[in-house]
Curated annotation (Swiss-Prot):
<dbReference type="GO" id="GO:0032574">
    <property type="term" value="F:5'-3' RNA helicase activity"/>
</dbReference>
<feature type="zinc finger region" description="AN1-type">
    <location>
        <begin position="885"/>
        <end position="934"/>
    </location>
</feature>
<comment type="similarity">
    <text>Belongs to the DNA2/NAM7 helicase family.</text>
</comment>
<feature type="compositionally biased region" description="Basic and acidic residues">
    <location>
        <begin position="954"/>
        <end position="972"/>
    </location>
</feature>
<keyword id="KW-0863">Zinc-finger</keyword>
<dbReference type="GO" id="GO:0003723">
    <property type="term" value="F:RNA binding"/>
</dbReference>
<dbReference type="GO" id="GO:0005634">
    <property type="term" value="C:nucleus"/>
</dbReference>
<dbReference type="GO" id="GO:0005524">
    <property type="term" value="F:ATP binding"/>
</dbReference>
<keyword id="KW-0007">Acetylation</keyword>
<keyword id="KW-0067">ATP-binding</keyword>
<dbReference type="GO" id="GO:0140296">
    <property type="term" value="F:general transcription initiation factor binding"/>
</dbReference>
<feature type="modified residue" description="Phosphoserine">
    <location>
        <position position="800"/>
    </location>
</feature>
<dbReference type="GO" id="GO:0005829">
    <property type="term" value="C:cytosol"/>
</dbReference>
<feature type="binding site">
    <location>
        <position position="926"/>
    </location>
    <ligand>
        <name>Zn(2+) 2</name>
    </ligand>
</feature>
<keyword id="KW-0820">tRNA-binding</keyword>
<dbReference type="GO" id="GO:0003727">
    <property type="term" value="F:single-stranded RNA binding"/>
</dbReference>
<dbReference type="InterPro" id="IPR036867">
    <property type="entry name" value="R3H_dom_sf"/>
</dbReference>
Length: 989
């Protein structure tokens, strides 16, 4: 390879690293100078108000201190943060700015954080359990120096074991043809064909082999098999990864295979299961351990003698003796380290831990035969070059379609710093150096199909063992609407659940989506799903905090994290809250496609996405996700959860009617979304308008038409049009016939039932959707003339009070195209009230609308209780207009019939009129919007005003002077009165 190519590559990488380093230093400086402690905590780099919960001595004499948040309430959890195991942190007293000590973070949970302090802090660090402390993440100079040193070594590398590898990796030459390898037996006989092909390919490659492992495909299993086969061939392996967690994962897997492994790194950064394989632990078990301990004891004794004596000659002798002892100690320790390193078949370390300024400097240059870099796609390319220079062959494993390397400098990332070595080589060499694992063992096939089509060119398939598994298949989990679907989309479009509009906030939150998440989790838990099997993923720290405040106390085992915290993890159910809901259509952090891929593919059996489709559809990739869930999953609107959300803003007046009704744990129904051409608001109302009731017996004289099962949900637009025309022809044939009813089979999908509802409404027919689950079917019948038998099917009239026996919602028309939005929304809420009242009805009570000739007492009772005209069944435009006008002149609060023609207040938040009893936003359900509006006004003007919220006017200067004179005069009079009284008192004495 031309020297200029290596030099230009190194120069570019050094420049990018310098930009990254400058950005990190500037960020830290800016935080310390301009950010308050609360702002630092909101950024995730500081933890405030911590108390010491326990102290103990850890491995090799280290002091482990566990901190917990100060207990001020029932929920004691740490705020959302970016701390991870291995971070260098500074400990500060809560009331002081000086740093008490520096330590290494060893463990962090939702409720506590543990820090390891060196022995040097034993006597200086006195921590009181009653005091409060804070932890601040510190910049790490060591990593930057090691990256820079590795690049300079690469620049000067002329001859050595890695010469051919450098030639291939930097583009000077193509990988050599594969060599023939002798037949071998797999340690793991359960490997699938793609995994076996990857193992054989990696062993046969001469310079480089890339294992592309999408989520759940057993990448680590494949890497372990490759390492075991290489060790069997007598090769020495250096295995690295960018994080301690990834390295320890490999340590655990290899330890089960009884191979000689050695883990390099700070003991405090290692998992407990990996600490017994650490270098310090191995040295403690070696033959030289006792000799080394004796030498250290001798050094301590000489130090003690040196302190006691005052004679200069003796002090000089003691110092010389200490030098000799230290020299002997160093020699014996290095000999023990070399012995341990050479005896190990596999040495494991992080990329930076494999640096030549560590224990590996004691080994010869050609000691290792193969370097394995796991999770290569998450590592900066410069960090990969630290281990790559130590062997002639490398095996890279990872997934460049998941999270990229983490960077701070946006400029450096755009210039190429966020582009990993694996991504660059895949684009450069393609199939000549890459083998992809194509069978995944984690996700339901519906989840797999989206990831495969969106990110992996359709090559990813689900193993039969997981292709159809659902939450309901878990032990003790009931078969419910939530546990029987792999994909669920809860759409908040048009429901007013906007993100928090805070200009000064660095993060985003959405309280409305938090409540939807809470309701869905409760539905899953009630069905028997263990909270520890559920993960909630949010893209913003503020949303994570809101979720933890709402859920952690009730479900302590529930994991709530950002996307970065779940890389490499999996859960039975995953709930994603996208947060963003705004009129500008801004998606912000969500625009990173790979983050969404990671979030969705953490789930095994169930994925629920809560988002505003109008906002996220402005991003092409997110639109494909929403469209896929719409086509292949269950779609619900937040309106279906409105019963559980709105009453929080109501007073007792609005909830008396259903105060004894059990609170529903989830939505009452779910339908698949209609075509994309429909407006989201219409979709929401149409979805919420279909209620459920028990399936009725088929009446005589009904006409039954069979319909092929529509189980294949991935239908194209042409198929949807064909089905629409088919249903239209069936209904038009029914209209022309003399049959009284037309019944459709239960094999129709929810989308097909929606089409039938719409077509029946167009023809002025009555359409009932009855039954639950797979037994749900539609019956279309002719409408009875108004007044026949004194009873007519009615829509709930907005101004009318609650009816004694409300008509089932399935008998209501799906939508009224001529009605205003106000009328639709109010009718929607009345329908929900009716559902709750209907759930309390006695079983012996006759169902409304079953017979055309009810008892006279029932007729009288219904006539007496029914107030206000009902909307006509026929499409009478004048009657509809009259109903809308009457609704506009009636209080829009549920169950209130007060007139607002003379006295009424208009709500600026929901654009409706209310009577004086319900006009306050907190009463009729606009409390959140009112508070958000008030916060916006305060944020915009920067002043919090008392009273009406108007700015206090400054007094006129002349009037102010007059008032000041009157005040001075009054004060003078009072002062003179006190003086005269004092004199009179003195005279009397």
């Amino acid at each position: 390879m031309a020297l200029s190519t290596v030099e230009s590559f190194v120069a570019q990488q050094l420049e990018l690293l310098e930009l990254e380093r400058d950005a990190e230093v500037e960020e830290r400086r800016s935080w310390q100078e301009h950010s308050s402690l609360k702002e630092l905590q909101s950024r995730g780099v500081c933890l405030l108000k911590l108390q010491v919960s326990s102290q103990c001595t850890g491995l090799y004499g280290q002091r482990l201190v566990t901190f917990e948040p100060r207990k001020l309430g029932p929920v004691v959890v740490l705020p959302s943060n970016s701390f991870t195991s291995g971070d260098i942190v500074g400990l500060y007293d809560a009331n002081e700015s000086s740093q008490l000590a520096t330590g290494v973070l060893t463990r962090i949970t939702q409720k506590s954080v543990t820090v390891a302090f060196d022995e040097s802090h034993d006597f200086q660090l006195n921590l009181d359990r009653e005091n409060t402390y804070r932890l601040l993440k510190l910049a790490n100079d060591v990593t930057y120096k090691r990256l820079k040193k590795a690049l300079m070594t690469l620049k000067k590398y002329h001859s050595g074991p890695a010469s051919s590898l450098i030639d291939v990796l930097l583009g000077g030459s193509s990988p050599s043809p594969t060599t023939e390898i002798p037949p071998f037996t797999f340690y793991n006989t359960a490997l699938d064909p793609s995994q076996k092909e990857a193992v054989s390919f990696a062993l046969a490659q001469k310079e480089v082999a890339i294992i592309h492992g999408p989520p759940g495909t057993g990448k680590t299993t494949t890497v372990v098999e490759i390492i075991l086969q290489a060790v069997k061939q007598g090769l020495k392996i250096l295995c690295c990864a960018p994080s301690n967690v990834a390295v320890d994962n490999l340590v655990e897997r290899l330890a089960l295979c009884k191979k000689r492994i050695l883990r390099l790194g700070h003991p405090a950064r290692l998992l407990e299961s990996a600490q017994q394989h650490s270098l310090d632990a191995v040295l403690a078990r070696s033959d030289n351990a006792q000799i080394v301990a004796d030498i250290r004891k001798d050094i301590d004794q000489v130090f003690g003698k040196n302190k006691k004596t005052q004679d200069k000659r003796e002090k000089s002798n003691f110092r010389n003796e200490i030098k000799l002892l230290r020299k002997e100690l160093k020699e014996r320790e290095e000999a023990a380290i070399v012995q341990s390193l050479t005896a190990a078949d596999v040495v494991l370390a992080t990329n930076t831990g494999a640096s030549s300024d560590g224990p590996l400097k004691l080994l010869p240059e050609n000691h290792f035969d193969v370097v394995v870099v796991d999770e290569c796609a998450q590592a900066l390319e410069a960090s990969c070059w630290i281990p790559l220079l130590k062997a002639p062959k490398c095996i890279l494993a990872g997934d460049h379609r998941q999270l990229p390397p983490t960077t701070i400098s946006h400029k450096a990332a755009l210039a190429g710093l966020s582009r990993s070595l694996m991504e660059r080589l895949v684009e450069k060499h393609g199939a000549g150096a890459v083998r992809m694992l194509t069978v995944q063992y984690r996700m339901h096939q519906a989840i797999t199909r989206w990831a495969s089509e969106a990110m992996y060119h359709g090559q990813l398939t689900a193993h039969p063992s997981v292709a159809g598994h659902l939450l309901k298949d878990l032990p003790g989990v009931a078969d419910t609407e939530e546990t029987s679907v792999p994909l669920l989309l809860i759409d908040t479009a048009g429901c007013g659940l906007l993100e928090l509009d805070e200009e000064d906030s660095q993060s985003k939150g959405n309280p409305g989506e938090v409540r939807l998440v809470t309701l869905h989790i409760q539905a899953l838990v009630d069905a028997g799903v263990h909270a520890g099997d559920i993960a909630v993923i949010a893209p913003y720290n503020l949303q994570v905090d809101l979720l933890r405040q709402s859920l952690s106390n009730k479900h302590p085992e529930l994991e709530i994290k950002s996307v970065d915290g779940f890389q490499g993890r999996e859960k039975e159910a995953v709930i994603l809250t996208f947060v963003r809901s705004n009129r500008k259509g801004e998606v912000g952090f969500l625009a990173e496609d790979r983050r969404i891929n990671v979030a969705v593919t953490r789930a095994r059996r169930h994925v629920a996405v809560i988002c505003d489709s109008r906002t996220v559809n402005n991003h092409a990739f997110l639109k494909t996700l929403v469209d896929y869930f719409t086509e292949h999953g269950e779609v619900r609107t937040a309106f279906e959860y409105l019963d559980d959300i709105v009453p929080e803003n109501y007073t007792h007046e609005g909830s008396q009617g259903h105060s004894h009704a059990p609170k529903p744990r989830g939505p009452v129904t779910s339908i698949r979304k209609p075509t994309n051409e429909q407006e989201n608001g219409q979709e929401a109302r149409a979805a919420a308008g279909q209620g459920r009731r028990k399936p009725n017996e088929r009446p005589p004289g009904s006409q039954v038409h069979s319909q092929p099962s529509s189980g294949a949900r991935g239908c194209d637009r042409t198929g949807a049009i064909d089905r629409t025309e088919h249903f239209r022809a069936m209904i038009e044939g029914f209209v022309a016939s003399k049959e009284s009813q037309l019944e459709f089979p239960a094999s129709l999908s929810s989308h097909d039932r929606l089409l039938v509802h719409q077509i029946a409404e167009e023809h002025g027919l009555r359409h009932d959707s009855t039954g639950e689950g797979k037994a749900r079917h539609i019956t279309v019948s002719r409408k009875s003339p108004a007044g026949s038998g004194g009873v007519a099917p009615q829509l709930p009239s907005p101004p009318s009070p609650a009816q004694a026996e409300p008509e089932p919602l399935s008998q209501q028309p799906l939508g009224q195209p001529h009605c205003s939005t106000q009328l639709d929304l109010k009718a929607l809420h009345l329908q929900r009230l009716q559902r709750q009242q209907g759930s309390q009805a006695q079983p012996a009570k006759a169902q409304p609308g079953v017979g055309l000739h009810p008892q006279k007492t029932q007729q009288k009772k219904k006539k007496k209780e029914t107030k206000g005209p009902a909307l006509p069944c026929e499409e009478d435009f004048d009657a509809l207009v009259s109903a809308v006008i009457k609704a506009d002149n009636t209080c829009s609060f549920a169950k209130c019939t007060a007139s607002t023609t003379t006295l009424g207040q208009f709500c600026m938040h929901c654009s409706r009129r209310y009577c004086l009893s319900h006009h306050l936003p907190e009463i009729h359900g606009c409390g959140e919007k009112a508070r958000a509006h008030a916060r916006q006004m305060i944020s915009r003007e920067g002043v919090l005003y008392a009273g009406s919220g108007t700015r206090d006017r400054a007094l006129d200067p002349a009037k102010r002077a007059q008032l000041q004179r009157r005040l001075d005069k009054k004060l003078g009079e009072l002062s003179s009165q006190r003086t005269s009284k004092r004199k009179e008192k003195e005279r009397g004495t």
